[in-house]
């Protein structure tokens, strides 16, 4: 390992040379209180920035071991340090001048959710901290401007590192509150199922968001207040006793007029699979971690999926036990989404009437009289919802504003009235007695077949170069194949999408062998990530700074939408 003075001398020697001379700076340098690694140097000033990392020994960083003695605390601590590093790094970005991306400093910009990221990691055995980020090495045209890089690495960066990665220099009370919040959130999450619940929304939560393009809380809105009949309490280690609405296992229907907050509540529950930062308003909105949003998805591909639980006897004779299509309809796509969610071991379905295929959700009595059951290939969801819970243990939360048929199978009915939830179960059930229940199938359907096995990606191995590109939060591409994730609505961050792309690529190249089923592949992949970290997905000499942990549910959703599976 070289000293920082070696780097300083090297920069002096390459000043004003051709830009490729920067390649000689790769390596690790001792800056006294931390180590700076130049992991990858960009090819020219207009290319993607250089990859750098900071490494601080645990004894120097000084964070209490009690702040990282569990996985969820490690994630909370690293998330907080990433936010601090981002704040300080943003202030010094582009202070050094030059052409192209000269002077740029960048690191992951965290959103409202607390996610495990490659941007910052901590070694639980010794407290060593690593932060991975990017920097644009300065140039005049395509000539090395080493004086400006010296300014970046020796003049600007050290203060940034000192003020954000050392316990003695940060706001310790704020960090303590972050760790305490993570403990409180974990306490609710681990006790949710044993209390017979699939979700919890604390009294006083702020559910509406600032706008359709912002996840920040809306100001001056009606705060959430649980109806008495659904109010439960948790004794938390730091917050103390907290009360709120506990949604029980089973079938829950959320109804109400338009604009009264039904979908806002469901959206909060969707993202309740993640922890949220203090001040978000959804800190104590906690959902079953396996919950899946189910919706129609016209045009998606489906590969060898058993949708016979919902669709049978197609007029073209197509096999629905192993169904394939490149252009699914609303009903077939939603049927596939349900079965694929079952395959991921999801215990909770979240469904909004607004984004569902009507013919998949319901067939009323008049339609059943006109079009006989044997003439209709679709078995609607309402006829399977009770079976899903009683036979498979899968609860459902459904938002409905126009169809009252779900009053019949629902165990719990909540009305959103001017953003306030009310328990109307008894009244709704009484009213439903005057309306006939749709007839149910006489026989239970066989279990869906989850033995889909796919071969290794030989078509990829033949490629001279494999390129994975993230297309925002909603898609990624592997070479020319785009995986559309617009309707996988529980992806919270673009860096999760990037991780999904690399996860699919790794699974296709290294795990799929024609023998392991898709769920086994996903389990093996998630176990590898848990053991080795997200960076294990990469065939790279350095750790990419832009990956965030996805759930198994989204990993399998990405696999299922890959048209070359």
Predicted regions and their residues:
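Conserved P-loop NTPase
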Residues: 416-497
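N-terminal pre-Walker A segment at the start of P-loop NTPase domains
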Residues: 208-243, 278, 286-291, 295-302, ...
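Flexible beta-alpha connector loops of hexameric P-loop NTPases
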Residues: 300, 310-331, 363-378
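Carboxylate/His-rich catalytic cores and anion/metal-binding grooves
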Residues: 193-199, 203, 259, 266-297, ...
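Glycine-rich phosphate-binding P-loop
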Residues: 242-274
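Conserved P-loop NTPase nucleotide-binding/switch module
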Residues: 341-385, 389, 402-408, 412-429
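N-terminal accessory targeting/assembly segments
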Residues: 1-187, 191-196, 207
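Terminal-proximal interaction/regulatory segments of ATP-powered molecular machines
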Residues: 483-565
């Amino acid at each position: 390992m070289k000293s920082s003075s070696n780097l300083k001398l090297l920069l002096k020697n390459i000043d004003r040379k051709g830009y490729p001379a920067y390649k000689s700076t790769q390596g690790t340098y001792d800056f006294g209180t931390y180590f700076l690694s130049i992991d990858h140097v960009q090819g020219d000033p207009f290319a993607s920035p250089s990859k750098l990392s900071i490494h601080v020994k645990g004894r120097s960083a000084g964070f209490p071991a009690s702040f990282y003695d569990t996985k969820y605390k490690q994630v909370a601590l690293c998330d907080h340090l990433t936010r601090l590093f981002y704040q300080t790094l943003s202030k010094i970005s582009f202070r050094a001048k030059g052409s192209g991306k000269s002077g740029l400093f960048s690191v992951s910009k965290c959103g409202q959710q607390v996610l495990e990221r490659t941007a910052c990691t901590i070694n639980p055995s010794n407290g060593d901290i690593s932060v991975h980020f990017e920097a644009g090495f300065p140039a005049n045209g395509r000539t090395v401007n080493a004086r400006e890089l010296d300014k970046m690495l020796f003049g600007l960066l050290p203060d940034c590192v000192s003020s954000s990665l050392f316990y003695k220099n940060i706001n310790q009370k704020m960090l303590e509150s972050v760790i305490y919040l993570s403990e409180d959130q974990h306490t609710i999450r681990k006790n949710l199922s044993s209390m017979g619940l699939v979700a919890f929304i604390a009294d006083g939560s702020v559910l509406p968001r600032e706008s359709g393009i912002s996840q920040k809380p809306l100001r001056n809105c009606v705060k959430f207040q649980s109806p008495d009949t659904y109010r439960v309490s948790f004794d938390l280690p730091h917050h103390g006793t907290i009360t709120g609405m506990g949604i029980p296992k089973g079938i829950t229907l959320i109804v109400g007029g338009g604009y009264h907050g039904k979908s806002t509540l469901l959206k909060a529950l969707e993202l309740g699979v993640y922890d949220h930062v203090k001040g978000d308003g959804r800190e104590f909105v906690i959902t079953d971690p396996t919950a899946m949003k189910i919706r129609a998805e016209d045009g998606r591909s489906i590969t060898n999926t058993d949708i016979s639980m919902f669709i049978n006897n197609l007029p073209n004779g197509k096999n629905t036990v192993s169904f394939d299509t490149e252009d699914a309809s609303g009903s077939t796509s939603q049927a596939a989404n349900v079965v694929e969610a079952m395959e991921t071991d999801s215990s909770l379905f979240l469904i909004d009437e607004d984004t569902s295929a009507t013919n998949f959700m319901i067939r009323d009595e008049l339609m059943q009289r006109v079009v006989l059951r044997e003439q209709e290939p679709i078995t609607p969801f309402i006829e399977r919802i009770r079976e899903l819970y009683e036979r498979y243990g899968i609860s459902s939360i459904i938002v409905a504003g126009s169809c009252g048929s779900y009053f019949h199978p629902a165990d719990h009915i909540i009305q959103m009235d001017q953003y306030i939830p009310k328990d109307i179960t008894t009244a709704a059930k009484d009213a439903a007695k005057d309306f006939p229940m749709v007839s149910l199938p006489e026989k239970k359907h066989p279990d869906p077949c989850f033995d889909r096995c796919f071969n290794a990606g030989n078509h990829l191995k033949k490629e001279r170069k494999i390129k994975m590109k993230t297309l925002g939060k909603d898609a990624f591409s592997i070479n020319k194949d785009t995986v559309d994730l617009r309707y996988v609505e529980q992806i919270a961050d673009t860096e999760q999408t990037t991780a999904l792309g690399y996860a699919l690529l790794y699974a296709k190249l290294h795990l799929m062998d024609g023998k392991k089923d898709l769920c086994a592949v996903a389990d093996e992949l998630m176990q590898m990530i848990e053991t080795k970290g997200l960076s294990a997905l990469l065939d790279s000499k350095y750790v990419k700074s832009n990956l965030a942990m996805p759930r198994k549910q989204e990993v399998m959703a990405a696999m299922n939408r890959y048209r070359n599976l």
